[in-house]
């Protein structure tokens, strides 16, 4: 390839796969945006508003983050901590942020259930 001076034309198969890939990405984008907006409507007092074109997670800032995470785990909701606490270092971002998954595996009802669980945890626990 170091000596190649021309660019080959994209094959019909590769073009088809590219179009297929782009349609999947578009569907994933719409699902994530819808899920993000739904959680924002229901958890705006806990939301950390991120300026992103392609949200990966809905990030909340909460007290008792680790307890909430364990509670959600009992409901089969697995929330990663992208900013873990570091022993000996106190940081509000590390201690309070929790990432809620919002990808296309989750439906509108799933998002509403997650929001309900989070609000229940803070209203009644």
Tell what function each PLM region has.
Residues 74, 87-125:
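PLP-dependent enzyme catalytic core of the Aspartate aminotransferase-like
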Residues 7-40, 49-60:
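Conserved glycine-rich beta-strand-loop-beta hairpin in the small C-terminal domain of fold type I
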Residues 1-6:
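Charged, glycine/proline-rich intrinsically disordered loops and linkers
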Residues 38, 42, 67-77, 117-124:
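Generic non-transmembrane alpha-helical segments
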Residues 47-88:
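Conserved PLP-binding catalytic core of the aspartate aminotransferase-like
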């Amino acid at each position: 390839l170091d000596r190649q001076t021309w660019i080959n034309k994209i094959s019909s198969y590769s073009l088809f796969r590219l179009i297929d890939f782009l349609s999947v990405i578009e569907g994933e984008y719409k699902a994530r945006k819808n899920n993000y907006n739904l959680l924002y409507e229901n958890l705006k007092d806990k939301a950390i508003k991120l300026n992103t074109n392609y949200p990966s997670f809905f990030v909340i800032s909460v007290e008792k983050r680790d307890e909430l995470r364990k509670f959600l785990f009992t409901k089969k909701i697995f929330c990663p901590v992208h900013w873990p606490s570091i022993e000996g270092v106190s940081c509000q971002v590390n201690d309070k942020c929790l990432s809620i998954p919002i990808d296309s595996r989750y439906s509108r009802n799933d998002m509403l259930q997650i929001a309900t669980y989070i609000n229940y945890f803070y209203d009644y626990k």
